[in-house]
């Protein structure tokens, strides 16, 4: 296993699927963060978007990593985009743990729209000690989905001195 940690929140399973692929390709530890709320269906969808717009912090359920967050060489944090923002769960994680993360932090954001999501990366960066290293903006139903994932993994490997596979 590498010194890379893949952390994610996923409401519907889409972000989870992406991070499972990335973690497997990087031989990285994979950890889910959640608040434990049922956010499924239209009510969950609307509530999640409202939480993101209000920037409502959520109380997260405890999560375990193999070592302290600062001990990893690289952390990859993934979130769905809700109402043009990172999920309230991801924001809560960053508020509570952003300063504990190593200098190398990269983001994976999943979304359905065609817009530029650079603002989401900037929103997330405000909770870190240094700006993110790399960002992957991913539309899971897009034709170039798999290529973008593989290119991102190659970039992370190169940054961390791992051989390409």
Region annotations inferred by a language model:
Residues 1-77, 84-87, 131, 150-165:
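N-terminal beta1-alpha1-beta2 submodule of the flavodoxin-like/Rossmannoid cofactor-binding fold
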Residues 12, 37, 82-84, 112-115, ...:
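Solvent-exposed loop/turn segments at secondary-structure junctions
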Residues 20, 24, 92-96, 126:
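Short, well-ordered alpha-helices that flank and scaffold nucleotide-derived cofactor binding pockets
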Residues 69-70, 95-104, 128-129:
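Short, conserved loop/helix-junction motifs that constitute active-site signature segments
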Residues 77-78, 107:
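Redox-cofactor binding/interface segments in oxidoreductases and associated redox assembly factors
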Residues 89-95, 120-122, 148-153:
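Charged helix-capping and loop-helix junction motifs
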Residues 106-144:
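Short, glycine-/small-residue-rich phosphate/pyrophosphate-handling segment
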Residues 137-157:
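A hydrophobic alpha-helix/topogenic segment detector
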């Amino acid at each position: 296993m590498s010194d890379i940690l893949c952390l994610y929140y996923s409401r519907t399973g889409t972000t989870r699927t992406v991070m499972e692929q990335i973690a497997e390709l990087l031989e990285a530890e994979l950890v889910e963060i959640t608040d434990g709320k049922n956010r499924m269906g239209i009510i969950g969808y609307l509530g999640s978007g409202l939480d993101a717009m209000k920037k409502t912090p959520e109380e997260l359920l405890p999560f375990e990593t193999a070592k302290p967050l600062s001990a990893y060489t690289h952390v990859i944090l993934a979130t769905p985009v809700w109402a043009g923002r990172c999920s309230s769960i991801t924001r809560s994680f960053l508020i509570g743990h952003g300063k504990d993360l190593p200098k190398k932090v990269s983001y994976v954001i999943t979304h359905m729209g065609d817009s530029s999501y650079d603002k989401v990366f900037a929103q997330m960066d405000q909770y870190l000690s240094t700006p993110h290293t790399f960002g992957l903006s991913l539309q899971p139903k897009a034709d170039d989905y798999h290529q973008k994932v593989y290119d991102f993994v190659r970039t992370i490997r190169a940054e961390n001195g791992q051989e390409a596979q």
